[in-house]
């Protein structure tokens, strides 16, 4: 057991060094993200493992661009589901990169999830909440497509689409992925 713990610890250190180097000038953000999570010097907590999984999901560019708010939003949202779901399924469902396409990195996960639960899924049985058809139908009815409003083709953030209910097709698609995750 101690040998396994030492192996985990050395793997963690190696990964963290790689993240810090890859983040270039953004290393302080990663350190600030990881600092409150560290429980014991010689142990690896589940929260640390989830944080490392999130960092692993980031592209090289996102390691340089990501903010502390985005990382914390991604880490702290869905924690209640952690205990209920098998690890590999949890990673596939919830630990996707915060950036979906080429939109700005913004902390949207918690606010969007709460908003969708209160509106889109309010009258939907639990068994249907993971059915993408429910969200697709809601998007068709509630989000107006207007490609002319976004002449520079800069994607609107998922929360921007949620609040405006108007978007170009690409921003609507990014919103759908964010909402479904």
Report residues per predicted region.
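Cysteine-centered nucleophilic/redox motifs
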Residues: 135, 165-181
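Acidic/histidine-enriched alpha-helical segments
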Residues: 154
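Extracytoplasmic catalytic/substrate-binding loops of multi-pass membrane glycan-assembly enzymes
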Residues: 151
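N-terminal accessory/pre-domain segments preceding catalytic cores
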Residues: 1-145, 157-161, 171
């Amino acid at each position: 057991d101690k040998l396994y713990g030492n192996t985990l610890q050395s793997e963690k250190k190696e990964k963290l060094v790689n993240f810090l180097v890859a983040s270039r000038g953004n290393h302080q953000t990663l350190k600030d993200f990881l600092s409150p999570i560290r429980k014991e010097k010689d142990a690896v907590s589940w929260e640390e493992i989830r944080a490392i999984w999130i960092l692993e999901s980031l592209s090289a560019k996102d390691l340089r661009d990501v903010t502390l708010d985005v990382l914390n939003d991604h880490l702290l949202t869905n924690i209640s589901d952690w205990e209920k779901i098998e690890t590999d399924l949890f990673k596939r469902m919830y630990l996707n990169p915060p950036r979906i396409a080429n939109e700005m990195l913004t902390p949207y996960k918690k606010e969007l999830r709460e908003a969708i639960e209160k509106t889109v899924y309010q009258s939907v049985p639990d068994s249907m909440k993971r059915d993408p058809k429910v969200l697709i139908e809601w998007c068709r009815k509630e989000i107006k497509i207007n490609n002319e409003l976004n002449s520079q083709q800069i994607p609107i953030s998922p929360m921007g689409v949620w609040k405006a209910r108007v978007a170009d097709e690409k921003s609507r698609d990014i919103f759908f992925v964010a909402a479904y995750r």
